[in-house]
């Protein structure tokens, strides 16, 4: 039987996901057979697994850090918020229904927890180490009885817990003490030590606080991780939507059910992006309609709030319009949806020659394609699709060449006048394509072309893990685990 190590935090947003990612790479580098795990994740951003199901982006990234193919076993329960206090429940990669928060807590949660623990124990039997990520705070008093992502998991497999605090936001010592005081004695005994994350300054200034914690709880501070400027995707529960107007003004419609907004990180890094919600704000050089958890409802929201008309007017004035997945479907001529919204046939925005019908079977695949859109014709791109929609068009954006490593020849997306839409999530992570697209608009504005500095997820994981390795006592962790 392998070992388990759990990363919990004093609150949401302390950096649990990336500390876990770093530890996944560190232990993989040390030669251990390591895999990630999170029993339940609530996320607007999902990614395809090797089995063809969905998992959260956090566990997808951690799998890469472990040098493993992303599996549905790494994130058995995925909750995808739909609005109105409802979420789609995805179990082992497959949607099993839509429930209210109350119904989920009272009915499905414990049953799914038991099944997810069977998955965790099977992983521990087959691997040297499972690095488990918790969720939010482990001591929310109103939720603790229903919490299946923190100490209940640690107790189930007797996993030592590293408690992470975000010192950048202040109050980290109080958060650690408060968390420890609200844990039961059994739970406190599972805590092996503390990590202070995102520190700017001289760590020696913190030593009096370290001594206090060690004296009070008999637990060591395992390290202080500096604030790291990085390009790894963060967990999205507390995601900030930037309002940065770059030389090319890129506006992204912040839909009520926006999903997979990690698609736009490269645009944010290369130029800056501006998320907008009001019709009067819409006047960018590039206007993007992102993916949506409920395409038709978001289209109707845009229509009722004047955003659809504002997009059409901006397009008439010369703005370039882009749609990704659900955004692509909205830009077409019509959508027939009896799956997500049950509204039947709905008129689209009409900027793309495409029609979409929603099927009950979701397509969740890794894709490699060749671009047909003229300014980037012939470029090889890759990404992934997560969709119910099936679209037909007279002018496709690209031809898919590979689906999950299997050779195919399928058209996808659509092209119109100063408009394109695609099902390829991650299209802008293809730097050659993004550079060509931005420079097309820059030339129109009389700006000099730019060269986007290429980077890879692998490089960023290695750089982040190296800093974490230098900042925490990994040898102590190895000895504590008995590896």
From Swiss-Prot:
Residues 247-433 form the GATase cobBQ-type domain. It comes from the Archaea. GO terms for biological process: cobalamin biosynthetic process. SUPFAM superfamilies: Class I glutamine amidotransferase-like, P-loop containing nucleoside triphosphate hydrolases. The active site is at residues 325, 425. The keyword Protein biosynthesis does not apply. Keywords: Cobalamin biosynthesis, Glutamine amidotransferase. GO terms for molecular function: ABC-type vitamin B12 transporter activity; catalytic activity. The keyword Coiled coil does not apply. Pathway: Cofactor biosynthesis; adenosylcobalamin biosynthesis. PROSITE patterns: GATASE_COBBQ (PS51274). InterPro entries: Class_I_gatase-like (IPR029062), CobQ/CobB/MinD/ParA_Nub-bd_dom (IPR002586), CobQ_GATase1 (IPR033949), CobQ_N (IPR047045), CobQ_synth (IPR004459), GATase_3 (IPR011698), P-loop_NTPase (IPR027417). HAMAP family: CobQ. Belongs to the CobB/CobQ family. CobQ subfamily. Catalyzes amidations at positions B, D, E, and G on adenosylcobyrinic A,C-diamide. NH(2) groups are provided by glutamine, and one molecule of ATP is hydrogenolyzed for each amidation. This is Probable cobyric acid synthase.
């Amino acid at each position: 039987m392998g070992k388990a190590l759990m990363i919990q935090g004093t609150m949401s947003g302390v950096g649990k996901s990336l500390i876990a990612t770093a530890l996944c790479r560190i232990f993989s580098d040390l030669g251990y057979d390591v895999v990630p795990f999170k029993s339940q994740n609530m996320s607007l951003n999902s990614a395809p697994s090797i089995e063809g199901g969905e998992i959260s982006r956090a566990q997808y990234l951690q799998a890469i850090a472990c040098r493993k193919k992303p599996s549905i076993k790494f994130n058995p329960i995925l909750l995808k918020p739909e609005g109105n206090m409802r979420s789609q429940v995805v179990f082992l990669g497959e949607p099993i229904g839509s429930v209210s928060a109350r119904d989920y807590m009272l009915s499905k949660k414990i049953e799914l927890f038991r099944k997810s623990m069977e998955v965790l124990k099977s992983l521990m039997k087959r691997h040297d180490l499972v690095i488990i990520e918790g969720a939010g705070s482990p001591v929310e008093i109103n939720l603790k009885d229903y919490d299946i992502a923190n100490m209940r998991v640690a107790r189930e497999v007797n996993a030592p817990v590293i408690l992470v605090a975000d010192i950048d936001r202040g109050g980290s010592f109080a958060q650690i003490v408060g968390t420890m005081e609200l844990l039961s004695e059994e739970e406190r005994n599972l805590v092996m030590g503390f990590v202070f994350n995102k520190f700017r300054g001289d760590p020696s200034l913190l030593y009096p606080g370290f001594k206090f914690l060690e004296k009070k709880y008999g637990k060591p501070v395992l390290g202080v991780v500096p604030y790291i400027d990085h390009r790894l995707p963060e967990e999205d529960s507390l995601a900030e939507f930037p309002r940065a107007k770059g030389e090319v003004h890129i506006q992204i419609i912040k839909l009520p059910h926006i999903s997979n907004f990690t698609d736009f990180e490269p645009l944010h890094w290369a130029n800056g992006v501006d998320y907008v919600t009001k019709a009067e704000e819409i006047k960018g050089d590039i206007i993007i309609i992102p993916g949506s958890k409920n395409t038709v409802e978001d289209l109707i929201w845009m229509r009722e709030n004047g955003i659809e008309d504002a997009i059409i007017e901006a397009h008439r004035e010369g703005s370039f319009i882009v749609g990704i997945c659900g955004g692509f479907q909205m830009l077409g001529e019509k959508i027939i949806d009896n799956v997500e919204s049950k509204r039947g046939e709905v008129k689209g925005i009409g900027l793309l020659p495409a029609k979409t019908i929603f099927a009950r079977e979701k397509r969740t695949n890794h894709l490699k394609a060749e671009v047909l859109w003229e300014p980037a014709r012939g470029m090889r791109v890759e990404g992934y699709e997560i969709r119910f929609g099936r679209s037909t068009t007279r002018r496709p954006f690209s031809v898919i060449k590979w689906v999950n490593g299997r050779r195919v020849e399928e058209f996808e997306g659509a092209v119109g006048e100063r408009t394109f839409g695609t099902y390829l999530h991650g299209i802008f992570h293809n730097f050659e394509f993004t550079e060509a697209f931005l420079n097309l608009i820059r030339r129109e504005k009389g700006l000099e072309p730019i060269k986007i500095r290429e980077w890879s997820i692998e490089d960023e994981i290695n750089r982040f893990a190296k800093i974490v390795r230098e900042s925490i006592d990994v040898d102590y962790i190895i000895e504590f685990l008995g590896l």
